[in-house]
Amino acid sequence: MEEEFKVTPWEVEGIIDYNKLIEQFGTSPLTDDLLERTARLTKSELPIFFRRKFFFSHRDYDKVLDDYEQGKGFFLYTGRGPSGPMHIGHIIPFFATKWLQEKFDVNLYIQITDDEKFLFKENLTFEDTKYWAYQNILDIIAVGFDPDKTFIFQNSEFTKIYEMAIPIAKKINFSMAKAVFGFTEQSKIGMIFFPAIQAAPTFFEKKRCLIPAAIDQDPYWRLQRDFAESLGYYKTAALHSKFFPPLTGLEGKMSASKPETAIYLTDNPEEAGKKIWKFALTGGQPTLKEQREKGGNPEKCVVFKWLEIFFEPDDKKLMERYYACKNGELLCGECKRYLIQRVQEFLKEHQEKRKKAEKLVEKFKYTGKLAQEQWNKAIPDPLKK
């Protein structure tokens, strides 16, 4: 009997069958042809997120590439709900987004939904979500986005978004929102209005919007695709990633609410190493003798999966490690030590950049070229109706 899995914007459980998920969500596979076309148009080698199919599904990405080829361009939009510290799983889609911004030379809008997290999380105050907004913004800036082509905006500050959301809210009836978000009679009225605010950035430019995000976030954009053309805009496009697995196994995704499953971006590198050593599940045999005789199972190993997704950029080295494990030449302890070294190097570098990001917050939010344009721009005519 096949194991069941569950993927919603709020829950991810079980071993995910990504091919089945494409069918369930009605998305399209990110094919080799599309990836080859991306490499050709950008004149670049694809990053590991695309080469190794961590991004595996899309909506209208082919049309995004058509628009780019025809000189129409496109823009990027992504975001973060600031409910606590960010971990490695949160930041990976931002690195993919940075590559897209850099190679296609396009604008990027990053929405920080401090209002949403206050409304949806009973245990958080508005002050909490504003605090985490600032902390999360530092991690996002540390990724290395172009400050003149990136606008990071916090919903509680960028109140113009409310003015844009009102005509959008007029396009979404309660049954549409309920079908996506599962609202009930107990749902707060602020929660019911929020989908309109989340859709607003897809109308920041009169071009097609591309959203790189994990597949569980896809339902948020289905609503926009239902009404965008009636406002004279494009249906938003999306690139979907798989989930970054928790330390404890390949089921579900890394969760900030379960500290033993996650490496936070602000973790002390030494403590992060201890956490990996203690909790990271491997695909090894019960004994050293059996490991040498039978070999390991990298397909079931979190350590190998982390290297594959993010921490081993060299394809040749990754495959050498894969076969050394399968042949019993590589022991789990050796692999863990290697991953610990790579994670610690990443954390040290990220935390240095995070410290420097403190001086860049104002530029990304207020004084950068794109930020100023957005603060000064009038509401688009179709959204005034």
Swiss-Prot record:
Record keyword Signal present: no
Extent of motif 'KMSKS' region: 253-257
Molecular function as annotated in GO: ATP binding; tryptophan-tRNA ligase activity
One of the record's GO cellular component terms: cytoplasm
Cited SUPFAM superfamilies: Nucleotidylyl transferase
EC numbers: 6.1.1.2
Entries under Gene3D superfamilies matching the protein: HUPs (3.40.50.620), Tyrosyl-Transfer RNA Synthetase (1.10.240.10)
Enzyme type, top EC level: ligase
Keywords tagged on the record: Aminoacyl-tRNA synthetase, ATP-binding, Cytoplasm, Ligase, Nucleotide-binding, Protein biosynthesis
Keyword Disulfide bond: no
Compartment list: Cytoplasm
Disulfide bonds: none
InterPro entries linked: aa-tRNA-synth_I_CS, aa-tRNA-synth_Ic, Rossmann-like_a/b/a_fold, Trp-tRNA-ligase, Tryptophan-tRNA-ligase_arc
HAMAP family membership: Trp_tRNA_synth_A
Database matches in NCBIfam families: PRK12285.1-1, PRK12285.1-4, trpS
Family: Belongs to the class-I aminoacyl-tRNA synthetase family.
Name of the protein described by the UniProt record: Tryptophan--tRNA ligase
Species per Swiss-Prot/TrEMBL record: Pyrococcus furiosus (strain ATCC 43587 / DSM 3638 / JCM 8422 / Vc1)
